[in-house]
């Protein structure tokens, strides 16, 4: 059974920082690109960041709205992906999901700013 479990959400003040974590099980994590996606009433579903494989030197890509503020990383030995969020803004409020190539999704974690 595939599982993606996010944690680390919670209330944060504007300008603050937060780190989200997602632990995966049920598939070979190191073989999958991983993404963070967020959902809000105002913007709907919005892709946030992507991290590729070791063979791609863990290349990362970001939405323009978070570039320079958010950092995605992964630890294949722990089957985990992370999202460090700095200088948070009200518009960053949403439910944050980790996903593979959009085939598998976690349950989401709420980040109210």
Curated annotation (Swiss-Prot):
Cysteines engaged in disulfide bonds, as pairs: 22-98
GO cellular component: extracellular region; immunoglobulin complex
Transmembrane segments: none
Alphabetical GO biological process terms: immunoglobulin mediated immune response
Keywords for this protein: Adaptive immunity, Disulfide bond, Immunity, Immunoglobulin
Keyword Disulfide bond in record: yes
Further comment found in the protein's record: This chain was isolated from a myeloma protein that binds inulin.
Gene3D superfamilies from the UniProt entry: Immunoglobulins
Entry-linked Pfam families: V-set
The protein, known as: Ig heavy chain V-III region U61
SMART domains, A to Z: IG, IGv
Residue ranges of domain Ig-like in the record: 1-113
GO MF annotation, one: antigen binding
InterPro entries recorded: Ig-like_dom, Ig-like_dom_sf, Ig-like_fold, Ig_sub, Ig_V-set, IgHV
């Amino acid at each position: 059974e595939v599982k993606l479990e996010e944690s680390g959400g919670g209330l944060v003040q504007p300008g603050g920082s937060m780190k989200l974590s997602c632990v995966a099980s049920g598939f070979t994590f190191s073989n999958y690109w991983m993404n963070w996606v967020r959902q809000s009433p105002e913007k709907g579903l919005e892709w946030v960041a992507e991290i590729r494989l070791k063979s791609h030197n863990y290349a990362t890509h970001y939405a323009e709205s978070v570039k320079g503020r958010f950092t995605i990383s992964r630890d294949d030995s722990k089957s985990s992906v992370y999202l460090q969020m700095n200088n948070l803004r009200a518009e960053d409020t949403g439910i944050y999901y980790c996903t593979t190539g959009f085939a598998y999704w976690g349950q989401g974690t709420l980040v109210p700013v």
